[in-house]
Amino acid sequence: MSLLQRIKQHLLPPSSRSFHAFETNANAEMHQLRLENTSLMQQLAYMSDQLTQITEQVNQIQAEHAYEQQRDMMLFWAEYQKPSESPIAAKKRFFRSLPKAKGNLQLLQDNQIKLFKEFDSICRNNGIIYWVGSGTLLGAYLYEDIIPWDDDIDVFMTRSQIAQLQELLESDCTYRITTLWDWYVPCKQIRFCLQDTNNPAFIDLFPLDLTNSDPEYAWNRVLEERASFVKDIRNEFQGTEWESIPYLPTTHPITKNIERLYREHVASLHDDINYVSSFEDATGLTRGIENIDELHSTGPYPINDWIPTQDMKYRDFSVMACSAWNTYLTRHYGNYFKIPKDINSHEHVANDYLNSEAVQNSMHHYLGK
């Protein structure tokens, strides 16, 4: 084909015959696509129907399983309970008969409890109030000890009393309070621990604020602000150094911006909630927006449910708890006499870390071994 013919073929419009042939072919392909699309839609409808049926069957199986589990537990407790024993006493006896922790977990728990006993002594000697929460409260009630598979201590304190404790320990040679911002949750971790950085024992401190606003309104308003705070954190700090250093010490330069954002949200709360500084003026307590989220909301916290505190036995000493401990535990766990599903997965301190020689030496030394 000559150069002139090739130019003519590319530049001149197609003939009527070739155009109609192309149109016929395109229409045929479009028809085939419509058929295939119709077939796919039919398959999708069938699969959707099948999924609905499977979901209904799964729900039915789960309901039957829940019923059978409940029936089996009723039969178990009826058999387990002694003639002269109350149902609650029987359940406590059962939980307290469960095997205790062994190995590294036992060593860590013994360190945690020794530290907790010393923390309690510091608080009582200095007029500082705290409340055990979450699994620590459950352990105090069910086991009079740490839960056999637990590895941390959770404590609530008012913000002003955390500050008082920090001031007490400012130049202490044995104890310290650490703070860092956690990207994963996100939250501000506040912990009471030893000056010995090789010892993994710690007590989580969760700040509460006193208010004389309506307790339920204040509680829900704080939940709203917490959600807004978390959203703003994700929007502002995603892709920053905080994401690559997920446990960010408060000495890091970027925390200035985190604290600025935090103060903005706290200021928003102060527009709607009246915060007070004394228990006498308070009608309730609210969680700080820097706290970790609860899986199930345990509030509101009317002040009469929390003050005065109630002592509960915890191994060889007593800990402070809220007087409405049953309400708190029920909101937090539902039926708290059930064995949880995270017995084997509950871990705050990695076992590999506990195995290190420096950590082992520190934990044994702290216990005087």
Question: Whereabouts are the PLM-identified features?
Answer:
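Conserved catalytic core of two-metal-ion nucleotidyltransferases
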Residues: 100-124, 169-224, 235-333, 339-369
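Boundary detector for helix-to-coil junctions that initiate low-complexity/charged tails
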Residues: 1-83
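Active-site nucleotide-donor binding segment shared across nucleotidyl transfer reactions
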Residues: 120-153, 157
